[in-house]
C-alpha cells in the first residue's frame, strides 16, 4: 500500500467499509497509522508483511494493487492467491506501469545497470498484455491504458518538489545512506526521476505507460 494514499482515501470516503492494507515497511505502517488517527479514521488496519508471505485474515469484495506487481515475478501464483481472497462476486483492480509489447526483468548485469541495482532490484517491467496471460484464476474484464505523458509530468513534479526542498531532503538521505553517500544518493534520485520522465514521454507516451485492469474470479 506504499504510504497509504489509496487506503486512506478509500477508508475516508467509504466509512462503512473495512480496509486492510499491506506494506513491507514498518515506517510506512507507522505513518499510515498516524495519519489515520489524526483524521479520525477507524476502519483501516495496516499489516507489515512481505506479500509473498501474506495470509489474508478474511475474504474481500474488492482488492486493489497499485504498482506492486512490478516488484513481483510469479504472477500466476499471486493471481491464484488473490482469487482465493476474493468473494465469489468480488473484483481485483490492478495498476501497473508497463511497456507496449515487451516484458523484461530488471537484472544487474554490470556497471551501467544502476536502475536495476539501486531502484528495481529483482523487479520486472510488465508488458501491457501480461495480466491477460495468467487466466487460470482471474480473468481481465476491462483494461485501460493511460498515456505515458501523464506519468512523465508526475515524475517531473516529483523532481521539482525534491529540488525545491533540498535543504530538508539532504538530512534524510544522510540518515538513510550515510554521510559519505549523501550527495551520491541525491544525484541518483535526480537521475531516477529524469530517466523515468524521459522513458514515459518517449514516442508521445505510447511506448511506456500505465495500465489499469479490472479482474474477476474464474468460475471453476
Regions of interest found by a model, annotated:
Residues 76-91:
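A short glycine-rich, Lys/Arg-flanked "PGG" loop and its adjoining helix->strand segment in the class I
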Residues 3-15:
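Conserved SAM-binding loop of SAM-dependent methyltransferases across substrates and taxa
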